[in-house]
């Protein structure tokens, strides 16, 4: 049984928190507003969140950035951190180990910072709307990102997709991935790639790589081709 659930939204514009104000089961919504969230400095994110968030167990969605922030936040608060959780039963948290070949269950006594993998829990519906509290926070920014280069794509990220169609080196050439993209567009899937395909063809970006050295996925349907 859970206690009061507070949703904390890190943002540069407090209106970004309005979309979660009516989530079912939410007791309170806090928009933590800071310019630090416009950048990618995990230390700054953790500093700003720590200054504004109430005490208690904190849940993050498990992404590369949020897991970094989660670790730093836990260190600042002197509490446990558990990453990539796929099941929660009271104080017992289960997460995969050895590249998904086994699961471990740890028991947490007291508060913790927990990152939860995407698509392992059902989404919540809408309930009564909550007021959004706005907290201005400052972060201790130690690094500055000069440039972010991102591959332009309107496609789903493989780590968040319910359906993935993934190609390997047997596709023959990166041009043949267009066939996978056509299928993906039809069924609403993300397009992934094996490590061999990513290593062989520079046209296939690492952001598409699925597996131990790529992205961890949890789809309802996975189609491997080539």
Predicted region positions:
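N-terminal glycine-rich FAD/FM-binding segment characteristic of electron-transfer flavoproteins
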Residues: 1-226
């Amino acid at each position: 049984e859970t206690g009061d659930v507070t949703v904390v939204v890190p943002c540069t514009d407090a209106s970004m928190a309005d979309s979660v104000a009516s989530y079912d089961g939410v007791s309170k919504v806090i928009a933590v507003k800071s310019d630090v969230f416009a950048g990618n400095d995990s230390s700054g994110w953790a500093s700003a969140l720590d200054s504004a968030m109430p005490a208690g167990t904190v849940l993050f969605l498990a992404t590369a950035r949020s897991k970094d922030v989660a670790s730093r936040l836990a260190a600042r608060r002197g509490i446990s951190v558990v990453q990539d959780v796929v099941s929660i039963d009271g104080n017992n948290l289960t997460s995969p180990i050895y590249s998904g070949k086994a699961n471990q269950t740890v028991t947490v006594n007291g508060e913790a910072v927990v990152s939860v993998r995407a698509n392992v829990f059902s989404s919540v519906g809408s309930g009564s709307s909550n007021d959004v509290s706005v907290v201005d926070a400052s972060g201790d920014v130690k690094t500055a990102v000069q440039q972010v280069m991102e591959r332009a794509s309107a496609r789903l990220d493989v780590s968040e997709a319910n359906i993935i169609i993934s190609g390997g080196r047997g596709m023959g050439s990166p041009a043949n991935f267009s066939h996978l993209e056509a299928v993906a567009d039809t069924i609403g899937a993300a397009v992934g790639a094996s490590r061999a395909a990513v290593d062989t063809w520079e046209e296939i970006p690492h952001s598409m790589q699925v597996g131990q050295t790529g992205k961890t996925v949890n789809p309802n349907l996975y189609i491997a081709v080539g």
